[in-house]
Amino acid sequence: MNVRGRVAPRRVTGRAMSTLLAYLALTKPRVIELLLVTAIPAMLLADRGAIHPLLMLNTLVGGMMAAAGANTLNCVADADIDKVMKRTARRPLAREAVPTRNALALGLTLTVISFFWLWCATNLLAGVLALVTVAFYVFVYTLWLKRRTSQNVVWGGAAGCMPVMIGWSAITGTIAWPALAMFAIIFFWTPPHTWALAMRYKQDYQVAGVPMLPAVATERQVTKQILIYTWLTVAATLVLALATSWLYGAVALVAGGWFLTMAHQLYAGVRAGEPVRPLRLFLQSNNYLAVVFCALAVDSVIALPTLH
């Protein structure tokens, strides 16, 4: 075989891998990872640490497909915005690496399969919650709130809170107050997390015409809102401690103090006219949420007396 004959198959393989990675990127794997961090502890707390491997696996698979479907449909709806924002210009649809109709078909297929998967493998409530989450994320947040109000991530962030509800309902078949407390934690955590990133890329949002709070408000106004929601986040984590042992409560208290310190430092820096470093808060907010929910998972499987 000559050199040209050997190179051709490599090119075909390379294109196929590139296409596969483009489809994978549509699902936003990093976002799905964060959802798993919250869903697993929710399932463990729902049954106080009793582990049901098959049920948990089916819930995670169904939840991942729902999240992947929602993220893919989000990419379809946001393709026009992504093309003009530097941060998102390399997304598959923005650079036309994937046909829009294929992305739409993928998103819808994943959504439908996730509903039936959760319904058949867990219960109808979990399946319905997943379906409602996808619809809310795509139609209410992406197509409506995101482009119309600076409070878009406050209300639209409810979609990101649903994995804990789905995980809890898959185990118990109901929704109880600890699930609502976990929902509140993520609901209040989302604005500081998102706005910190948006502060760094506010010019992108301004160019795209997306009224994200940092794009339409002063840095002082934004950091004040970040501070308020950070306090609400920490308060919600402490409320959840009523359903756990002292281990989770202690971690939530210490981690909350750390998270609040960063938020206060950002606000104080803006008031003092110092250079803004919002990405630090954005990155550490991920670590904060992971620490809190990992502590919840450990607390749920260790036989310790609860606080209530």
Swiss-Prot record:
Cell membrane: is it a keyword of this entry?
A: yes
Q: Which InterPro entries match?
A: Protohaem_IX_farnesylTrfase, UbiA_prenyltransferase, UbiA_sf
- Which reaction does this chain catalyze? heme b + (2E,6E)-farnesyl diphosphate + H2O = Fe(II)-heme o + diphosphate
Keywords tagged on the record: Cell membrane, Heme biosynthesis, Membrane, Transferase, Transmembrane, Transmembrane helix
Instruction: List, in alphabetical order, the Gene Ontology terms for molecular function in this entry.
Output: protoheme IX farnesyltransferase activity
Which EC number(s) does UniProt give?
2.5.1.141
Tell me the CDD domains matching this sequence.
Answer: PT_UbiA_Cox10 (cd13957)
Q: Which domain of life is it from?
A: Bacteria
Q: Which NCBIfam families match?
A: cyoE_ctaB, PRK04375.1-2
| HAMAP family reported for this sequence | CyoE_CtaB
Q: What name does this protein carry?
A: Protoheme IX farnesyltransferase
